[in-house]
């Protein structure tokens, strides 16, 4: 599975450390920009954005190991090994340094890249930089290991897990094929405002991913302490996120909290009204415009008004009425 773009060049990069290959698509001319998709999708996520950013840059859109047309990740992979695979990708294609755009898990890969390979990273555009509540992150990782998270299609029927990401028998194959409908329903619940075309492609991407086996990036990701890493990041950074994205309390810290942990002197936030998990598909023009404007001049980029950001950060994914905060910021004469 890949984008349906006709004008891209398609190929495979050789990854020296894992001995595998990584599928990618590229187009355009100019400074390199690498797009990293979220779990459990593949590079179709950026289909609408790539041609617009390629007007000013050479864009690269790979399928992470275990996704799309790339082979499964080795079973021994940790999260930082997934990051290393992108350095191997750059090495094989002769990319000395690049800017990066990523959504959700792709943003976490970018954070690790910027921290451990600062000389290879120019500018960063994070989509939904997700910091799990720490106890939840660790319990999810342990639960997935216990039920055989890398072999989800073969697991026994288990009880549902958390509100985000079911640690359950959802992904096991069933003789009546109903598991395929469950994949669809999961994607539709998460992206009910998006086009059926996108929901269908996300469903197919999930099926394709779990048919591969190998190390699952989301399992590896849950072992990664993002909060420990963020203060070491100094590159110019933009948080590009939809106001309907799932990266919100109480399961995650806010995007503003994540941004404040960075040591970047240029540190901006852009909120796309109406955007959710499928932000880059549903709002391709708005995302491409923000990406091009920020890459062109990070310091001059304005982003979203601080008051609008503050209001957006109050919204919870799951309301917690024990933590209500009331503010009166009106201006009074007397």
Identify what each model region corresponds to:
Residues 107-118, 124:
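Short glycine-enriched nucleophile-adjacent loop
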Residues 265-332:
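Catalytic active-site module of serine/aspartate enzymes centered on a nucleophile-bearing elbow/loop
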Residues 115, 123-169:
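Flexible "cap/lid" loop of the alpha/beta hydrolase fold
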Residues 60-105, 116, 280, 285, ...:
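Active-site loop/oxyanion-hole signature of alpha/beta-hydrolase fold enzymes
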Residues 135-136, 160-232:
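Conserved alpha/beta-hydrolase catalytic His-Asp/Glu region
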Residues 2-21:
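N-terminal cap/lid segment of alpha/beta-hydrolase-fold proteins
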Residues 20-71:
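Conserved HGGG/HGGXW glycine-rich cap/lid loop of the alpha/beta-hydrolase fold
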Residues 236-275:
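Conserved loop-alpha-helix segment in the C-terminal half of the alpha/beta-hydrolase fold
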């Amino acid at each position: 599975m890949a984008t349906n773009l006709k004008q891209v060049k398609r190929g495979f990069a050789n990854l020296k450390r894992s001995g595998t290959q990584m599928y990618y698509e590229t187009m355009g001319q100019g400074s390199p920009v690498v797009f990293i998709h979220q779990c459990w999708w593949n590079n179709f996520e950026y289909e609408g954005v790539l041609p617009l950013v390629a007007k000013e840059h050479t864009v690269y859109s790979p399928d992470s190991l275990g996704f799309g047309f790339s082979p499964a990740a080795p079973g021994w992979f940790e999260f930082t090994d997934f990051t290393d695979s992108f350095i191997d990708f750059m090495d094989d294609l002769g990319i000395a340094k690049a800017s990066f755009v990523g959504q959700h898990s792709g943003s976490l890969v970018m954070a690790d890249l910027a921290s451990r390979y600062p000389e290879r990273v120019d500018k960063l555009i994070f989509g939904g930089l997700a910091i799990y509540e720490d106890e939840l992150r660790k319990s999810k990782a342990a639960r997935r290991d216990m039920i055989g998270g890398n072999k989800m299609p073969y697991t026994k029927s288990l009880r549902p897990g958390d509100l985000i990401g079911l640690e359950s028998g959802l992904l096991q194959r069933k003789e009546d094929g109903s598991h395929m409908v469950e994949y669809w329903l999961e994607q539709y619940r998460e992206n009910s405002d998006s086009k059926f075309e996108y929901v269908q492609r996300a469903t197919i991407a999930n099926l394709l991913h779990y048919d591969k086996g190998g190390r699952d990036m989301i399992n590896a990701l849950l072992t990664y302490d993002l909060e420990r890493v963020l203060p070491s990041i100094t590159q110019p950074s933009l948080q590009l996120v939809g106001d309907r994205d799932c990266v919100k309390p109480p399961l995650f810290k806010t995007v503003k909290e994540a941004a404040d942990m960075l040591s970047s002197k240029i540190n901006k936030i852009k909120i796309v009204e109406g955007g959710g998990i499928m932000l880059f598909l549903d709002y391709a023009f708005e995302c491409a415009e923000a990406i091009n404007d920020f890459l062109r001049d990070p310091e001059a980029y304005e982003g979203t008004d601080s008051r609008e950001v503050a209001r957006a950060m109050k919204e919870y994914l799951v309301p917690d009425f024990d933590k209500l905060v009331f503010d009166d910021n009106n201006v009074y004469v007397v």
